[in-house]
C-alpha cells in the first residue's frame, strides 16, 4: 500500500477531468496536477459549437442528446465544482491554446481564489494545447517535481 500523504495525480487535457473527479472521491490524494483542462462543461460546449460556426442555440440540443445517449447530464460535468479545500492543485495551460481555450485556465484561477482552493498556476508562454511540457520540458519538470515534493510529504 501507499501512505495516505504520498498519493498524487496528473491529468492532461480531457484526462484531467476524471483525475479531478477521482481526487474529489478519494481524499487521500494530496496533490493534483492539471494540464490544459476544461473548467466547466457549458464553456467547452460554447467553444466547440463556435469552432464549427454554429449558433449557440444548438447547445441545449447537444446537452439533451448527450444525456439521452449516455445517461449522464453533461452540465453536471464541471471539474471546477469538484475541487476541494483539502487538496493541493497545480494548473498549467498554454496561452495560445485553441483546443481548450485559455479562458478555462482563467476560470480556474478566479474560482479557486473565490473558494479558497489551494492552487498554483503557470500559463506557458507562446504555447498551444499541452505544449508547455514539450516547449519547456526542463521548467515543466522542475515545477512538477517541486509541486509534488512540497505536497506529498
Residue ranges and their predicted role:
Residues 106-153:
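C-terminal catalytic histidine-bearing segment of alpha/beta-hydrolase fold enzymes
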Residues 21-72:
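Hydrolase active-site cap/lid region
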Residues 2-12:
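Alpha/beta-hydrolase fold nucleophile elbow
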Residues 98-104:
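Conserved alpha/beta-hydrolase "acid-adjacent" motif
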Amino acid at each position: 500500500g501507499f501512505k495516505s500523504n504520498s498519493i498524487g495525480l496528473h491529468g492532461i487535457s480531457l484526462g484531467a477531468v476524471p483525475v479531478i473527479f477521482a481526487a474529489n472521491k478519494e481524499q487521500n490524494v494530496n496533490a493534483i496536477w492539471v494540464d490544459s483542462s476544461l473548467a466547466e462543461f457549458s464553456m467547452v460546449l460554447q467553444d466547440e459549437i463556435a469552432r464549427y460556426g454554429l449558433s449557440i442555440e444548438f447547445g441545449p440540443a447537444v446537452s439533451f442528446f448527450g444525456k439521452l445517449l449516455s445517461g449522464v447530464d453533461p452540465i453536471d460535468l464541471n471539474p471546477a465544482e469538484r475541487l476541494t479545500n483539502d487538496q493541493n492543485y497545480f494548473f498549467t495551460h498554454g496561452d495560445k491554446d485553441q483546443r481548450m481555450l485559455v479562458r478555462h485556465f482563467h476560470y480556474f484561477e478566479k474560482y479557486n481564489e473565490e473558494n479558497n482552493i489551494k492552487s498554483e498556476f503557470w500559463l506557458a508562454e507562446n504555447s498551444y494545447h499541452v505544449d508547455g511540457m514539450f516547449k519547456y520540458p526542463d521548467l515543466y519538470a522542475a515545477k512538477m517535481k517541486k509541486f509534488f515534493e512540497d505536497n506529498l510529504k
